[in-house]
Amino acid sequence: MSTSPHPHPNLGTITAKAWSPTPGAAVRQAATVVVLRRAATGMQVLLMRRAPREGDIHSGASVFPGGLLDAADAQGSALCSGLDDAQASAKLSLPHGGLAYWFAAMRECFEEAGLLYAAAQDRSHLDAAQLAQIAAQRTALNRRELTMGEICTRFGIHLAADRIAYLDHWLTPPGVPKRYDTRFFVAEAPQLQVATQDDHETDAQQWLSPAEGLERRKELKLAPPTYKILELLQRLGDVDAVLAHARAQANVPCTMPRLATGSKGLRPVMPDEPCYAEIGHVDPEGHGHASYDLAPAQALRLSPRLIRITANNGSMMTGPGTNCYLIGGGDRNEWAALDPGPSDDAHVQAIVDAAPGPIRWIFVTHTHKDHSPAAQALQRRTGAQLLGMAALHAEWQDTDFVPDVPLAGGERFDLPGDSTLHVIHTPGHAGNHLCYRLEQERMLFTGDHVMQGSTVVINPPDGDMGAYLKSLRALMALDLDWLAPGHGFLMPQPRRAMQQIIDHRLKREAKVLQAFGGGGPYSMDQLLAAVYDDVPPKLHAMARRSLLAHLLKLRDDGVLAETPAGLWGKAGARVPGATAI
């Protein structure tokens, strides 16, 4: 029996009184069973409540039955039937020893919940009398007066490994005092048996639908793996679908939350959160100093040569706010500011305060009013040189930005702190848009060319959809590890991120072409309703600008044509007047 039977990462927000991050904690192996049953109202799942223990932050948490692997589990795996070690190890992506996890999961389920997944030597099911005799040994097993292997031998049974299926894999984040590498299995509740708590490790149990468990998440003190698995069960819907899903999985990825701090204190961050990859980059050992918030005016050190400050201009269009990056350092302790942001005295002060040394250069990606207007104020405060490209169109631009050093793309700057900045002209979002590659970190500062969590607005005449896609494809040829966007956290897998943007734009383009199935001509209003029927009306003003960008690209490609009356039809077709879509 495990001394810590419920290996889940920390619960919700963690208070400093509970514990502090502990980098370097050893990782222990564990196994858990998600037990399901069929009820009149649908699928239900078994949750056990952890008994209270002094100093245990998991006391009272509702969990699936499970616990640590014991040394005897490796030997006990010889008493499993329906699966051999080679098959089990392959499912877990282990070289060997995989069947011990199956044995441990079934042992723990019997110890804690009184549910036994076992079969007679001839693989037949056990009858009620046999099950009652074995159940009587549960107390001795929990007292360690007997082992599971001894029970199997005494009663001539095998643990039925083929009756549970591998479902999920979770690893406690670095920094948590007790770390667990936990394999989650799933099974239907065995026949002729009733789940009961052991009144030692667990003091209560209940059957709930996944929806009920999720609704009561806080009350039940569900740990991240528990509620994430409940979400999966809810999506799949019924017992058969869950078991089929588990058995069909070829590779089960390992999910590891990461610790970070922010407005809600120290908490685990899930891999699907935008900040996850950055947290791993900034704080791989789990000291807890990385942030899951982009808080205005707070400087965050992303590397020895890189600091980020976010402006207090968050909105639907700017996301959490515009990022300003400080690049440099080294022996000279001199810095460059990239994208100083909107005209905001408090933000300019925050940039000055964040710089460990004098700011000598101010680089700008483009002259939209959330990126460059602070350049003049920051220059007045620091005497720094302005570098970038002046606005090519007056509309929606910061026309006051006049660079001391005009850039066209292709330039390289050797900055302090062994920091080499390569300038790349990337028209599309704006005609004067520049991206900057920090060569030593294989990082691209994308401005608005790539944003986290949304697609950028392509707004003609300065915005050009054809140029945008061409620029993206050119960037995909670069050797990059990270994107540093003008809005959002650091982004991993740059090629994948850019390909997703291209795919999204081309999917929308295909929808534009589909709207011309009847030939046309069509008005902008007709096309907007057909092409952006998946976009809320409140966003249709911006969608209209993107639609125009698509139409202009297709016109330049020779696919569509615009009439003098402002209608759109297929190139070469006669277009006397607007028709209905």
Where are these regions (language model features)?
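Metallo-beta-lactamase
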Residues: 211-213, 332-344, 412, 420-511, ...
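Residue-level signal for inorganic ion chemistry
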Residues: 305, 351, 487, 512, ...
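C-terminal regulatory/interaction regions
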Residues: 287-295, 514-581
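N-terminal leader/linker segments that precede catalytic domains of diphosphate-processing enzymes
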Residues: 1-296, 301
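Active-site HxH/HxHxD metal-binding segment of metal-dependent hydrolases
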Residues: 315, 320, 342-422, 442
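Active-site beta-strand termini and strand-to-loop segments that position acidic
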Residues: 36-38, 187-189, 327-331, 415-417, ...
